[in-house]
A protein has these predicted regions:
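C-terminal beta-strand-rich structural cap/linker in extracellular carbohydrate-active enzymes
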Residues: 113-123, 749-778
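Glycoside hydrolase catalytic-domain groove-lining segments
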Residues: 446, 519, 526-614
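Conserved "repeat-terminator" motif of extracellular CCP/Sushi domains
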Residues: 34-44, 106-124
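Catalytic-core region of carbohydrate-active enzymes that cleave or remodel glycosidic bonds
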Residues: 439, 443, 504-512, 579-648, ...
């Protein structure tokens, strides 16, 4: 029958059946309606994205996988199987959620509605951290390597951070531990410390090791010898000096110093007429009262420098002054070189100053140039120094009659173009520092022929050999960009090293004029070791590694086998060891022998001065040992003048400065170390240093022994060519009592046996100690 597009329905009623027909006027169809589709959304947790999930079967768009989060479309009733990755971003699969059923990484979904499923992952977990060795002893003065074992689940991190803790209530340092678990012991040390390793992934998980710190057992030390019959040279009393900066009268008196220096950056521009100075780059280039020169309180009715001379005279110490060579002095007590009103955008300001003085740097820390030096300062020439010396002679007498003994020719030309760049922006040259030095020295000597002059007061290894102009030119000259790379100034002066040229010119002046203008070759020697990337100078004692580096680096003053990578060979092209390499080898500085050689070659008769140095650790016994070693070296090596520069207020640094008391006031009655050096040797200077001297006032042999180790050492001290006249007096300074040098029981001196001229003592030298022995001699 032909389909006419009719719809037929059978209507059933009570006992009746009706056939209903409805026919349309157009054509008809029998195509079924489209199937229903649903969306399957796939998420992930930990991580929230990027997890690869595969789907079977493919969806209606022929897609079978994706990276979370993503969606698939399926017809109603479709049965879909999803498979997730077992790990994602190092995290482990844990479960599915939203599935019809799931089994491990497989998720089954029947698509009867829009459905969202989530693949859940868990991050790696840390279960525990253990530290080995645990427990363990650690001998003071050594290092211990610790390892950490981290346990956990998943792709966890084994990284840890290391710390070391002192016992609760302890004020002693626990030592240090580096990022790799290498522990360095402290001294002085608590009885125990705890080394802790903490997981970087989960800081709630850590492990520890109990460390017992033990002193080394008493051991036999090296043989020591002092030859009373071998007097090598007189020891200058002026090696026991300090800089006046922050030096209070009590410290100066108790340490019985012999000379005090008015020096440092703030003294370069001191104006004696107005008693004002400029702080230079040290503090915002500010003018201020003259007390800025030494940091001491003002004395009524007296200029700062005059007050220092008066104070020094009271305790019997000589005064070493500083006269300007760089050409400027402060003109008042309030101006500054870079006030905010003139330079409104600087990196830093001193808002405590009414002028809001700036640091002379732009906001990006580039240097401001072209400032007017006359805002703060007055230009002066050599006659200024001469007039000042004449004034001082009138006030205090000539040097020969108790006045100012020595004058430094300014301070550290090396840094004039940095520290004093507001008035001296250009680096110094050979001619400037030499010619101005000669002219200023002549003015000083004319005003006081009995005064001594010291110069060039040079800091910085490279400026011993090159002018600062050379050094800065070298820094910008390839391929090495090194201090020696462009030595035009040196080349224009016959290739002569700067210090030697300086000496030669003063020698030439004397030869032509029969007048010595330079009495001391003067250097600043900040040559303390660098340890773990930091200088040990101007710091606290540190761990035993730092302490040992500090003590070892005193060798820089004398030892031909000691080198430091900071001090390379000068590398001038005519040097016999010159190399074109940009990494020339280190050179042993041998500072005092080097100075002595320069003088012998270039200006015989010139004395040797080091009027700034600092080895740090001064709050501790370690600083005292280093300072005592330096003073002993100064005496043994024949230095003529030395003045220590403080870390901070000397009264708070007395453990370190007690080294001066060892040599100048060991018994509290101003008894001193001898004044005539005796040949003295130690079989191991790194363990026990020994310095001997004859005290000519009473014929006693004085000996200083420094135990640099962390254990007690017994040693035989042989006194050659000495017959004792009684027992030895013994004085000890150690960590057992940092407040005082303590008298010990007398020590028997065994006289020479028949056929010998050598007496002996057999003391025990406590760990980290300084011992003074006074042996009466027939």
């Amino acid at each position: 029958m032909r389909n006419l597009g009719c719809t037929v329905a059978v209507l059933m009623g009570t006992g009746l059946s009706l056939l209903a027909t409805a026919c349309g006027g157009g054509g008809g169809t029998n195509t079924p309606p489209p199937p229903t589709t649903y969306v399957l959304t796939v998420h992930s947790v930990t991580p929230a994205s990027g997890v690869v999930v595969t789907a079977t079967p493919t969806d209606i768009n022929n897609v079978s996988n994706g990276n979370t989060s993503f969606s698939l479309s399926y017809n109603s009733g479709a049965k879909v199987t999803l498979v997730a990755a077992a790990t994602a971003n190092g995290n482990n699969f844990s479960s599915w959620s939203g599935c019809t059923t799931s089994n491990g990484i497989t998720c089954a979904v029947t698509m009867n509605a829009n459905t969202t499923v989530t693949a859940n992952y868990t991050g790696p977990t840390i279960a525990s951290v253990t530290v080995a060795p645990n427990p363990t002893p650690a001998t003071i003065g050594t290092q211990v390597q610790f390892t950490a074992t981290v346990s956990g689940t998943g792709s966890f991190s084994s990284d840890v951070t290391w710390t070391v803790l002192a016992p609760s209530g302890s004020t002693l340092s626990p030592g240090t531990i580096n990022a790799f678990g290498l522990y360095t012991t402290p001294y002085p040390a608590p009885a125990t410390v705890t080394v802790v390793a903490t997981s970087t992934q989960d800081t709630s998980k850590s492990g520890s090791s109990a460390v017992t710190l033990v002193a080394p057992a008493t051991a036999a030390g090296p043989a020591l010898t002092v030859d009373a019959g071998n007097q090598t040279h007189a020891i200058s009393p002026y090696i026991y000096g300090m800089n006046a900066y922050l030096l209070d009268a009590d410290t100066a008196k108790n340490t019985n110093i012999t000379i005090s220096r008015w020096g440092g950056d703030s003294t370069s521009r001191y104006n004696y007429i107005k008693d004002v100075t400029n702080s230079a780059a040290d503090w915002y280039f500010e003018n201020g009262d003259g007390t800025g020169g030494d940091g001491m309180p003002a004395v009524s009715g007296m200029s700062a420098f005059d007050a220092l001379v008066t104070s020094n005279n009271t305790i019997g110490a000589k005064t070493l002054g500083t006269v300007p060579v760089q050409g400027w002095v402060a003109k008042d007590n309030y101006q500054c070189s870079f006030p905010e009103t003139t330079y409104p955008i600087q990196y830093s300001y001193d808002y405590g100053n009414p002028l809001h003085c700036g640091d002379g740097e732009n906001s990006d820390q580039t240097k401001i140039t072209g400032n007017d030096p006359t805002v703060t300062s007055t230009a002066v020439g050599p006659s200024w120094a001469g007039d000042w010396v004449a004034y001082l002679v009138g006030e205090f007498g000539s040097a020969a009659n108790g006045g100012v003994a020595i004058y430094d020719l300014d301070n550290e030309p090396s840094w004039w173009d940095a520290t004093h760049r507001d008035v001296h922006p250009s680096p110094f040259t050979y001619d400037e520092v030499t010619n101005n030095g000669i002219a200023t020295a002549l003015a000083v000597k004319t005003a006081d022929p009995t005064a001594a002059v010291s110069g060039p007061v040079m800091d910085y290894w490279w400026d011993y050999f090159y002018s600062k102009q050379d050094v800065e030119s070298g820094w910008s000259t390839g391929p090495c960009n090194a201090p020696w790379s462009s030595p035009l100034d040196r080349s224009n002066h016959n290739g002569t090293p700067l210090i030697e040229y300086y000496l030669q010119q003063f020698a030439a002046y004397e030869a032509a004029n029969n007048l010595r203008l330079l009495d001391y070759l003067d250097l600043h020697t900040y040559f303390a070791a660098t340890y773990n990337g930091h200088s040990v100078a101007f710091t606290t004692a540190g761990d035993t590694g730092t302490q040992q580096a500090r003590l070892n680096s005193t060798r820089v003053f004398w030892d031909p086998t000691y080198t430091d990578p900071n001090f390379l060979q000068p590398n001038y092209p005519t040097d016999p060891n010159y190399t074109t390499s940009c990494s020339p080898p280190a050179q042993a500085p041998q500072l005092i022998p080097m100075m002595r050689t320069w003088v012998a070659n270039d200006y015989p008769g010139t004395k040797l001065a080091i009027d700034e140095y600092n080895w740090g650790g001064l709050e501790s016994i370690n600083g005292a040992l280093a300072q005592a070693d330096i003073l002993g070296i100064f005496g043994r090596e024949g230095l003529d003048l030395g003045t220590f520069w403080p870390t901070t207020h000397p009264s708070t640094q007395m453990p370190g400065l007690t080294a001066f008391t060892i040599y100048r006031n060991y018994d509290g009655a101003n008894s001193t170390f001898g004044d005539m050096a005796l040949a003295s040797t130690s079989a191991d200077q790194a363990a026990l240093s020994v310095y001997g001297a004859l005290r000519t006032s009473d014929n006693a042999v004085t000996v200083v022994v420094i135990n640099k180790t962390y254990g007690d050492l017994t040693a035989t001290l042989s006194l050659a060519n000495l017959t004792p006249n009684g027992a030895a007096k013994v004085f000890l300074y150690s960590n057992a009592n940092l407040a005082a040098i303590v008298a010990q029981p007398d020590l028997t001196v065994t006289p020479p046996p028949t056929g010998s001229t050598t007496s002996t003592l057999n003391p025990t030298f406590p760990a980290q100690s300084i011992t003074v022995l006074v042996v009466p001699k027939t």
